[in-house]
Amino acid sequence: MENVRAHLYIKGKVQGVFFRQSMKEIAVRYGVRGWVRNRSDGRTVEAVLEGPRDAVAKVIEWAKVGPPGARVEEVEVDWEEYKGEFQDFRILPTV
């Protein structure tokens, strides 16, 4: 199975709705590693996902809807070179 890396920017009503915690739970369930954090604009969540292509794709599909209470307007996905740099999935501080 090919490993991939995706850098996501999820925009809309995605802060204050447990988006980061929910994404972490979904990522761990599918064996995806990386991180997620809020952006200081108040309407963007950023994430980097690494893992098998099908597992990363499942997390991206989930991100298009998000948890209850979220209203996702846009998901930008930038495919990057796989680095294998993560041991787990973390919630990082807001930037």
Curated annotation (Swiss-Prot):
Keyword presence, Transcription: no
Top-rank EC class of the record's enzyme: hydrolase
Name this protein carries in UniProt: Acylphosphatase
PANTHER family: ACYLPHOSPHATASE
InterPro entries: Acylphosphatase, Acylphosphatase-like_dom, Acylphosphatase-like_dom_sf, Acylphosphatase_CS
Reaction(s) this enzyme catalyzes, per UniProt: an acyl phosphate + H2O = a carboxylate + phosphate + H(+)
Active-site positions on this chain: R20, N38
